[in-house]
Amino acid sequence: MNTAADASADLDPAPAAVDTVDSSYLQTLVGYNARMAALAVIGHILPGMARFGLRIVDFSILSIIFHNPGITSKQLCGALNLLPPNLVGKIGTLEKRGLLVRHPHPQDGRALGLQLTAEGRALMQQAELAVAGLEAQSTQALTTAERRTLIRLLQKLYLG
């Protein structure tokens, strides 16, 4: 039977207090760096989105619809890697806010196309300008060429 005493016998002597955290191994991983960069950029953008009453996912949904009027929910889920049950509530909320409408799809009678209302289009014109500015601020450590390269490399990872 293993006891706490047996387990502690297997441990090295008690380490000293950690003054500086060593994350050097994690910093060699693409996933860790991509996540940390995403958190930094999103953290900079979130307060700007709040003034429009949007979260990042709301902004992404509205942006895709803005640039693809008539898109179906299925296409939207594919574009944003969302599960259909998660999208249904978001679409309903945005529709109640008067930002989008659903209408019969011209080729598929079972599907509904999504389209922004005039209010939704006006909001997105302002929100996309704001996000572009906020993202420029959060990536100001990069040159224009570095920013383009970073986007291209990230897309290479998730688009294949």
Task: Show which residues each predicted segment covers.
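Pre-recognition alpha-helix immediately N-terminal to the DNA-recognition helix
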Residues: 33, 40, 44, 60-64, ...
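Short, locally clustered residues in the helix-turn-helix/winged-helix DNA-binding domain
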Residues: 35-38, 63-67, 128, 155
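Residues within the alpha-helical elements of helix-turn-helix
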Residues: 64, 79, 97
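Helix-turn-helix DNA-binding elements, focusing on the entry/boundary residues of the two helices
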Residues: 73
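N-terminal leader segment of winged-helix/HTH proteins
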Residues: 1-52
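Helix-turn-helix DNA-binding motif, specifically the short coil turn and the N-cap/start of the second
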Residues: 83-86
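Charged, amphipathic alpha-helical coiled-coil/dimerization segments
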Residues: 42, 70, 92-158
